[in-house]
């Protein structure tokens, strides 16, 4: 199996990449920045907000093995009430959090089918997909889109008789650069700021490494056809 992960420079993506590298798998990392130095890690420099750049990726060269695709790359965007934003970045947030995963799923589903290889997709979602959080309008919308995309893609693959596995997982509250960004926002713009400071100060943030371990345990379980999971519930 070959593992393809977006957004491996830090946080959850890097932890998942390192987990699989330590297990002896080849890992392809896709993103603008790369911080992993490993013989079995192949960095692919790509701006995942650029549709043309994604479409130009040579996926055919990756499908000599079965594929695990982890769509991890994501951004929170401007943390401010939508009506207070001078230059909303909704387009960029949707491009990275929802459109890039869709394009990669499309590309790899087609190439895996042509090469007679299996495809497993893991889309990293968030509790914000199901709960409106003021000042996170673009992020909430993009993760909701990702969840519907995941379920629809799974049903489409079932219609085609493909054995594609699709998971859309919420990792919980994790100690990542995104959490640091959240804590940097004043409560004037983000009313729930204090809650996230409390998570950090009370040591309630999960480590990215724990998330990687829980994801691995989930993927080792027999596949039930269930798409949505909270990694908090995985022991």
Predicted segments with their positions:
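N-terminal Rossmann NAD(P)H-binding glycine-rich loop of SDR-like oxidoreductase domains
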Residues: 9-11, 17
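Rossmann-fold cofactor-recognition segment
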Residues: 38-51
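Conserved mid-core segment of classical short-chain dehydrogenase/reductases
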Residues: 74-91, 110, 135
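Active-site loop-to-helix junction immediately N-terminal to the catalytic Tyr of the SDR YXXXK motif
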Residues: 85, 132-140, 152
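Active-site helix of classical SDR
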Residues: 105, 142
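C-terminal helical subdomain
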Residues: 168, 176, 186-235
């Amino acid at each position: 199996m070959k593992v393809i992960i977006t957004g491996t420079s830090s946080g959850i993506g890097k932890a998942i990449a390192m987990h699989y590298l330590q297990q002896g798998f080849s890992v392809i990392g896709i993103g603008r920045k790369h911080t992993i130095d490993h013989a079995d890690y192949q960095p692919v420099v790509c701006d995942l907000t650029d549709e043309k750049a994604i479409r130009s990726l040579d996926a055919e060269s990756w499908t000599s093995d079965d594929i695990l695709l982890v769509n991890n790359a994501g951004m929170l965007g401007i943390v401010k009430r939508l009506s207070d934003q001078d230059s909303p970045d909704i387009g960029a947030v949707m491009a990275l959090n929802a459109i890039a995963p869709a394009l990669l799923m499309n590309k790899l589903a087609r190439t895996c089918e042509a090469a007679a290889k299996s495809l497993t997709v893991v889309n990293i979602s968030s509790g914000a997909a199901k709960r409106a959080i003021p000042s996170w309008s673009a992020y909430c919308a993009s993760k909701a889109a990702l969840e519907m995309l995941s379920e629809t893609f799974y049903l489409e693959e079932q219609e085609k008789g493909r054995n594609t596995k699709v998971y859309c997982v919420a990792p919980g509250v994790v100690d990542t650069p995104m959490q640091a960004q959240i804590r940097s926002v004043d409560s004037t713009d983000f009313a729930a700021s204090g809650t996230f400071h409390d998570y950090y100060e009370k040591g309630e943030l999960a480590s990215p490494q724990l998330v990687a371990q829980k994801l691995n345990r989930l993927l080792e379980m027999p596949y039930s056809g269930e798409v949505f999971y909270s990694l908090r519930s995985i022991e």
